[in-house]
């Protein structure tokens, strides 16, 4: 289809899976057709939460204590004690995430996650607020505070009324500026281009020491409930402007 249409540029609006992990980006590279968003390597690394956190750490970004669980690992002997969060290492959109509050839930988790054919990442739970920052062509837009009844699940992300987005986030100026700075550094550390969105967890009681980067998304959602269009609108950019910027930045071999 792509060869028949022979487009000048491909706007990659895919989300998750092969559309986000470097696979489709690799196809565009083989076809030598410029495409939007991040390239093969950046996309693949960002999709691997464990590896991307290692890179963030080398660039001085604070990350949460974690442990990578392989298929044969059992949860009983892990050093990180509840409360913690466990999620697919290469997943997205909060699919498959479990929040474990009590040790009694471990056996249930062993049945769910033990001997599976994919890796999972276990992270110490950090109480506090969920913050996020979009970066467009290297510049941060603003900080959004994501308010939910419990935690930012799949339903909270995509269902109308599932979460409340406070723009700009009502947080201290130093934390606000730190979020912007961290988001740009994360974008640069993975060699990303186009638009990305970095998610943070902030424990208010600990101030600057309580701010952690969770992950970076190279294919952030662009729906009416999505965070990037909301942030862009707040800073005076409409969806058309974002799309034009991404198309102008489209390229191969980056």
Model-derived features: where do they sit?
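Phosphate-binding site of ATP-dependent enzymes
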Residues: 101-181, 201, 206-212
């Amino acid at each position: 289809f792509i060869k028949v249409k022979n487009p000048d540029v491909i706007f990659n609006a895919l989300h998750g899976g092969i559309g986000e992990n470097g696979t489709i980006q690799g196809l565009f590279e083989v076809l030598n057709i410029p495409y939007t968003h991040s390239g093969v390597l950046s996309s693949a690394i960002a999709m691997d939460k464990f590896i991307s956190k290692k890179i963030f750490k080398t660039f001085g970004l604070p990350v949460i204590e974690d442990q990578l669980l392989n298929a044969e690992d059992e949860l009983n002997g892990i050093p990180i004690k509840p409360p913690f969060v466990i999620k697919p290492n290469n997943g997205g959109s909060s699919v498959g995430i479990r929040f474990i509050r009590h040790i009694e839930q471990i056996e249930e988790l062993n049945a769910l996650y033990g001997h599976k054919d994919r890796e999972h990442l276990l992270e110490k739970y950090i109480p506090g607020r969920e913050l996020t920052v979009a970066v467009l062509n290297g510049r941060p837009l603003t900080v959004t505070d994501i308010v939910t009844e419990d935690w930012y699940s799949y339903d909270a992300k995509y269902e109308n009324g599932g979460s409340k987005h406070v723009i700009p986030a009502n947080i201290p100026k130093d934390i606000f500026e730190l979020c912007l700075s961290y988001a740009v550094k994360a974008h640069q550390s993975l060699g990303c281009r186009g638009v990305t969105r970095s998610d943070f967890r902030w424990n208010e009681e600990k101030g600057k020491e309580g701010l952690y980067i969770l992950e970076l998304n190279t294919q952030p959602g662009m729906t009416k409930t999505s965070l990037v269009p909301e942030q862009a609108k707040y800073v005076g950019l409409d969806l058309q402007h974002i799309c034009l910027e991404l198309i102008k930045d489209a390229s191969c071999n980056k």
